[in-house]
Amino acid sequence: MKNSSNIKTTKTNVHSNRFQVGRVLQVIVALVFLIFLGRTLYISISKTVAGENLSTRTAALYKRNQVLKATRGTIYDRNGFTIAEDSHVYTVYAILDHSSINYKNKPEYVVDKDKTAEKLATVLPLSKEQILKYLNPKTKAFQVQFGSGGSNLTIEQKKKIEQMKLPGIKFIEAPSRLYVNGVFASHIVGLAQPIYNKKTKSTDLVGTMGIEAYYDKYLAGKDGFKESSVDASEYQLPNGTNAYRAAKNGDDIYLTLDSQLQNYMENLLTRVQNKYQSKALTAVVEDLRTGKVLAASQRPTFDSQTKKGLTSSYTDLLTQSTFEPGSVFKILSFAAAINSGHYNPNELYKSGSLTVNGSTIHDWNVTGWGSIPLYEAFPRSSNVGLSILEQKMGATTWRSYLNKFGITKKTGITLPGEQAGMIAFKSKLDQAVTSFGQGVNVNVWQMMQAYSILANKGQMVKPQLVEKIVSPSGKVIQNYKVQKVGKKVVSESTVKTVLQGMQDVVNKQYGTGTTYKIAGKSIAVKTGTAQIAGPNAVSYTHL
């Protein structure tokens, strides 16, 4: 009886435990139900999940936004010849996954790798063996590209490959810039290169150098957009365009450059570079009356189309670099001495050497030409003669003219990164040597601007690279006119005297530029050489 009683007690306990567990489970289920009910009520009222509006999310599933790309403006020369224009490049890739089948149940993957490699090798700069390596990757891949050899393809290359009708061979299109002349004022025209835009998730052409960078906001234009309603299969619904803004194409820019002169200059510089293996060369042809630059180039340079010669350390030598001008600076010191009344052409001076503050200034002909009149100093390019004129002017007067000539002031040339230069002017020696272009650093545009006094009766004119900016509709937005810089620096009579001195450089037997004489032509010249800083950077080598 006792055992029977124990069994009954055990059964009662088990039943009680089951009942309690059941009650707990009921409570848990009820709580879960209440939580889900509360969550459902909250979502139905607030219409949000994790901070995201459900209506907006649902609407987005049936909408497609498309960026309408603007065409970048074209860059022309002064005569309307194209220098840079929009284009496209292509990257070829191969689909390898056998699941890629089109709606006609035909393969969209590479079927015959050997044949595909053989055909592609006739167009791409890759061998058949190299292409086969790409088509047989070590790890499984849905698709593969062909490295640099399969990118930046032209439309002609793309068409050749398409004509082969190779299954699985596809293309990715990307915006590009076509520079039709290759090496052509590359530092001035600059570059526009494709850069991925995270905001629009598309690739944009962005100016990174030269005119392309400086006028990027004009050239770039503004992308448009199109918002469309689609069905569950992502087909656009009839009348499904909800919002639309047309792309605004970029403005066209007409440069002052003359293509014929520019190409001729490029050829000349290449010949000089090849002959003398120069470390650096610069050249500018400018209409000093208007400031319009007709041609300009440098060495080293690069091919804008192929990028050959372009390095990360590339510098625009005309704008972003400064140099000691040497004897060509004598045009300015000569003009300042004349205009300030300190030039007596018939006054004699002893050439050859001059001591200033214990240091000796030498003429390029260190023995000199004896006692000669000051009017021979400029044609002979006499350092001593110009130093004497600087001493006659005095530091205050000479420095005031340097300021008027814009030395150490940026010209505002429409190119990125212009350097202002500097001048050493503390000691008597510093002041004297600036008269023949030492102790002063300038950029090329500063010198061209200062030289413009010779064509404008003493008035400086700013160098210009842009003729006009024209909208896509043909409206002239900006028309660049002659821009005077400050007040007249020197008088018209001073200019005439300087020009006579420059003609004497060519025409007089003692002139340094007699080799430039052309029969029947009146030519004004100033030759120039310079000393360069020695290895200790505190002295000059002698030239």
Question: Positions of the model-derived regions?
Answer:
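Beta-lactam-recognizing serine transpeptidase/beta-lactamase-like catalytic domain environment
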Residues: K2, A84, D231-T241, L281-G326, ...
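Periplasmic/cell-envelope proteins involved in peptidoglycan metabolism and beta-lactam response
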Residues: M1-Q305, R399-K404
